[in-house]
Each structure stands twice: as C-alpha cells, then as structure tokens.
C-alpha cells in the first residue's frame, strides 16, 4: 500500500526493538468512505507497529538481513518472514485455529493476540493485544452503524455518527480521542453532502489522516 511509506517517513522512523512500552504516538488513516479506520501506526517506546484491517502486518522495509521460513517449518509459515536483523517473527498455525492461522504471533519477545470465535463474530480474528496494548471493538448490541468497528486502543476511544445524526454522516468516524472528524451536510449545498469537511484536534501524539492524503 503506497501510503504506508509516505506516512512513516513524515511522522516517524519504523524501528522494531524487543520491548513494547507506553504508547507515545498513534496515527490513524481513515478508509476512503470514512466509515472505518483503514490503517494504524502505533509508536510505543522504540517499537512501531502497523495494523491494517485490524491485523498486525509487517512493514515494507527493514534494517539488516532477512530470513524466511521454509517448507520444513510447515505450510502455515512457509515463505513468511522469519527474521529481520536481530528481530524474530513467529506466526500462529493450524493448531491455533482457523480464526488466527497465519497471523503474526510475536515480534521479538512481544506477543500478539487475536479475538477468536468465542469472543463473537464482530471481533473474531481481529487483533486483541500487542504486548500491553489492548484493542476493543463494537458488538451487535452497539447497533449496526458500529458493529465490528474499532472501539478503542488503550485509552483512545473511537466514536461514530449514527442514524440520528443524519444520512450524510451516519456510520462515519466521529471522534478518535480528542480529534473530531466533520462532514458536510445537506445545508451546505451543492454535491458536498457527506464529504469530509475537516479533521480538528491533531496533536504530536495523536494524528488522524484522510485516506486521500496518504496516496
């Protein structure tokens, strides 16, 4: 995805170490329709994590030599990155269940967990924790506008407009932490209704970016 590299160069250097600490910076990239969060960069201590579609993924570039799992490591790991420099990667396999098979299990000594079928279909297969960083999702009791969408990352709450806010903004991202996301409505005239109007409240520690800016 081309916006990964652009955002990472502008906001911080992607460096993985063996220890996850308190979150110092989080960057949220909205989806094209502004209804969900497409990508998340989390900086914790000297570690940086990239989450896409609610799963931890590996960045596009590394420092140091790369090694990969081969056929002797099993079909669920074969061909996947094993190490980058002094950082080792491990993955869940078929014995861990189909919900999480093939997903990243650990980065160095940082464990990664995912919600499974026992947590409900709204969160099944989505990242639950990265080290001490916790993720939560809305469920069916929160309504169709929010069901399955990101609810929080630690203390950062994510809220969405609902049907009572009008058709133009219904189900779109409303706030992420102290950052507000605003949309044009029918009173603004023309063909702008429902389009992104502004993102207010970005700070050094929390940034929200519209999808188009990352391309």
Where are these regions (language model features)?
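Repetitive, compositionally biased segments used for assembly/scaffolding
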Residues: 23-215
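Bacterial Sec-dependent N-terminal signal peptides
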Residues: 1-23
């Amino acid at each position: 995805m081309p916006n990964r590299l652009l955002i990472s160069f502008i906001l911080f250097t992607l460096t993985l170490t063996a220890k996850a600490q308190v979150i110092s910076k989080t960057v949220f990239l909205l989806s094209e329709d502004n209804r969900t969060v497409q990508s998340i960069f989390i900086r914790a201590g000297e570690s940086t994590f990239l989450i896409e579609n609610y799963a931890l993924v590996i960045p596009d570039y590394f420092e140091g030599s790369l090694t990969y799992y081969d056929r002797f490591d099993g079909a669920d790991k074969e061909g996947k990155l094993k190490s980058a420099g002094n950082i080792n990667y491990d993955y869940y396999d078929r014995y861990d269940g189909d919900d999480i098979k093939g997903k990243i299990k650990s980065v160095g000594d940082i464990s990664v967990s995912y919600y499974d079928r026992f947590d409900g279909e709204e969160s099944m297969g989505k990242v639950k924790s990265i080290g001490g960083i916790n993720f939560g999702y809305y469920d069916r009791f929160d309504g169709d506008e929010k069901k399955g969408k990101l609810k929080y990352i630690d203390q950062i709450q994510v809220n969405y407009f609902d049907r009572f806010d009008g058709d133009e903004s219904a189900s779109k991202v409303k706030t992420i932490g102290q950052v507000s996301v605003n949309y044009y409505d029918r009173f603004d005239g023309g063909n702008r209704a429902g389009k992104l109007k502004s993102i207010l409240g970005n700070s050094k520690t929390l940034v929200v970016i519209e999808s188009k800016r990352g391309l």
